[in-house]
Amino acid sequence: MRRVTRTIAAAGAAIACCITMTACSSPFGLPISGSVQTLAPVEQQAQRVYTNPQGPADDAQPETIVKGFYDAMPAGVQSDGYRVAREFLTGSASAGWNGDSAALVYSGTPDFRRRANTISAPQGAESSLIVEVELQVVGSLDSHGVYTPSNSTQTRRLPYTLMKKSGQWRISSLESGVVISTADFEQVFRQVSVYQVSTSGKQLIPDIRWLSWRNWRTQAVGEVLSDAPSWLEGVLRGAGLSTIKLAVDSVPVKNNVVEIHLNSGINALNEEERGLLVHRIRLTMGDGNAEYALRITGDGVDYSDADANVKLTTEQPTAGVYTLTGGHIVSLASSSPLRVGEAPGYDDARGFVFSSSGGAVLRADGVVECLKSDGASCGVMFSGEPMRSITEGLDGEVWAVSENGRELHVSDGGKETDLKLDWLGAADSIVALAVSPEGCRLALAVEGEDTNGVMMTGVARNGDKTLSGLSKAATQVSVLRHVTMLTFYNDLNLVYATTPPEGNSEQQEAWRQMAPGPANAQRLPNGTITSMASGQISLSRRLAIVDDLGIVRSVSGSLDGSWTIADSQVTALGAQ
């Protein structure tokens, strides 16, 4: 067999990568310390395309009426509050329909077909029939703006009952909620991070929602005051906000200042709780900007400065990228690769995490070996039990997936913790995992009978940020099968990829998304990718990959740019 040289690359801080047992040996190492940098909040779409739908034409056929309703729904979410969409409904149907209660997101072109209505037309109607719409649904939103992906290979049929009165067809019966195309989704829904406070009281968790552009501020305040989704239960600091509501169902902007008027419930909070609430609202309104200007009152009392002493920020630690090549540990953080340690004997390593304070390597036999800051061994972890993959956690943690894929193991400063996932099906197993930058979310690639795809669950922390447990629930963020590697590019965006059949790199898939949210295809360089990570390369934050020839490439910004080689000599540094 021809031997090829290759590298094992590693990325760091709270952003990690993992690979499966069968994947090639090119994992990234993850730094566990370093300076803190402020990441610019994700830029919200500034130039939206506003739609101007037309109402129903006289004598329009039933299919045309339903098509017109579909054309009008995006404007209802975005700007007109369903004024035009309701023109396609009968009066009683309009009164009972709530477009904001949910959303279905579809790809492709809907198919509109009529069929007979077996129920007699209601009194006063000249005729009645059903128009059935067949869709490729890729996801849905609930009333809180939480996104859940769907299997797009399965079609869904939505029935609309129409009646004819005075010679005109109108929709008389339909389910509440809207149906929006993937092309329109980000034009009509705004991504909003509802910032939650972890059980440690020292970390902020971005709880991603998708809210209608026309009144997103009002909805966002409501979500800050509402219960968190089930997958974060048990990992958030309780605040007792059930009695606090908006005094009026509106959040106006006056002289470029957002004004939020709450009822007297906020007065019952103590000073610390009130400060945290105001801070969470400020960060949520400002996309993570702690200096965002707003005015908050509670029953007429001005609390705009209540968070003046709250120090929680959305800043993330700088994440370096390291490679394990030919027995050397190399940092790619600066403009030129820098050798920082010696770790011989791991040419067939299957995983690697590292920082200036040390790390760990997943040996070819599955045993996780501790590394000192100079690369020297400091013993084995997890009692020498074989593991499937390892990844970096918070402040030096090493997370590992058991060989059977059923349990997680965490090493932190010599203390080891075993974790079980209550939501994992009996026939399911974990393939890979990544820990979010703040350390309070886990993304896991899962395969089995009950669950396939990428799941996300919460991580509970003590006051000193040490691990205390996991949420008992999880949320699905992708239904893509055979995911074997994943990493948080930043605190909002998750990137993941499959391992293709041997010798067929063209079948390898990679995706990125604000999680949970719609996924976008991630372009990969040529070759078969064996591992990925995120961190600082050549003085800027980048997504990095390593291919089956050991070449490390990286891309930055929107992740749609050109891939550049991070180290042109890696093919001579190690052997598989």
Swiss-Prot record:
- Report membrane topology: Lipid-anchor
Q: Which GO terms describe its cellular component?
A: plasma membrane
Q: What's in the keyword line of the UniProt record?
A: Cell membrane, Lipoprotein, Membrane, Palmitate, Signal
Q: Which InterPro entries match?
A: Lipoprotein_LpqB, Lipoprotein_LpqB_C
Tell me where it resides.
Answer: Cell membrane
| First-listed, main subcellular location of the protein, grouped into a coarse class | membrane
- Lipid attachment residues per UniProt (N-palmitoyl cysteine): 17
Superkingdom to which the source organism belongs: Bacteria
Annotated signal peptide:
1-16
The Swiss-Prot or TrEMBL record describes its family as follows: Belongs to the LpqB lipoprotein family.
Q: What is the protein's name according to its record?
A: Lipoprotein LpqB
Organism, by scientific name, is: Bifidobacterium longum (strain DJO10A)
Q: What is the lineage of its organism?
A: Bacteria, Bacillati, Actinomycetota, Actinomycetes, Bifidobacteriales
